[in-house]
Amino acid sequence: MSHAADDLDRWMRTAFVEMNTELEELYFAQEDRANVDGVGDTIKAALVDEGRALIRPLAAEGNTNEGFDHAFDVLGNLGLFLAALRRHELTNPARESQSPFAEASALGLHIGASLGVAPRFATAHLATHNRAVDGVQKSFTALADEFVFIDYNTMGILSYKRAADALMRVPPLGISNRSTLMLLNNARDALNDVAKTNDILFTRLDKDRFFYSVRPYYKPYRVGRQEYRGANAGDFSGINQIDLLLGLCRANDPSYSQLLIDKMLFMIPEDQTSLRACLIHVPLLDQFLDAAPSASGKEWFRLNCRAFLEVCEAHGFAAVQHHDRLFESFIVKMSDALDSKHHAQLTASGPPLPVLAKALERLRDLRAAAKRDDFETAHGKIETLKRAVGWGA
């Protein structure tokens, strides 16, 4: 890492965190906790000045070809800086045609283009690629609730990746292979771990602190002239690999395929490759349905199909859990009490909250194979397999 990159990283882990934390305490002490205007202006000015002074020499260096990890780390630091400026209303895409922070934008665009990723901070920067130093990883603030959010989101993502890795190993083996049973059980166990970490997250995370002091750092902002949506907890390939390999979601569903396209550049290149790779495989649901007429009485089918259904059930449970206990409780219900003047750009993804809520509800019910009359889910096909193996008997 160059001296300039090292200096920025050190600042991001110290003064940057301290200033954001101080601002959050000022905001949170107000009657209107969502207000940031006219609060802590001296701190905000220092945040801008110190950050820009450290970024200028880095921008002069450009992408120094020191490998993916170095470049992605620098991009993350630039992105965290811009996200903090957006949170404190020092930049806002609604009132600008381009970012007022030219140096950070220029370097971010350079690195993003060279790596094939969006030129802003992404979920991976605070999750799977968030290097801890002396036991402390990067964050916006020193608030305990932010670390609860970062830690248990990261654990959930890693468990999803374990499940996806197990399922990706099934197609070369075939659904009747004895080793497939082990892999399906591995995937189920990993998804059960997702539910366990979700439960800890929802129990320990304070709703007010999350809504007012953590969530606002995940808003859209401009890099150069382009506005980029905020980082989303689902910006990794594992959860979609599971959707597609199980057959609960389909790539030929226009709404779902649009989701895949929209998130592609917000994932690391390795994840982009993994997501593309899983698109060539016939979903396991279809394979078990095709085999059922001739194999439902055979031991391999009974064991492997039941294990497959357990994976589907675990995936659906985690999806319902996340939607109902995090999104509904920590965002939708909290926003109901928010002054309407703060509703603009409430969500990380950009669209109004009711639009986002409808899209996420649809995704939840696809993953849960829920019975819906207004769109097709895997409900009927899953019920057919359950009857074939005597599920619940």
Language-model features: locations:
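Surface-exposed peri-terminal alpha-helical interaction modules
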Residues: 1-393
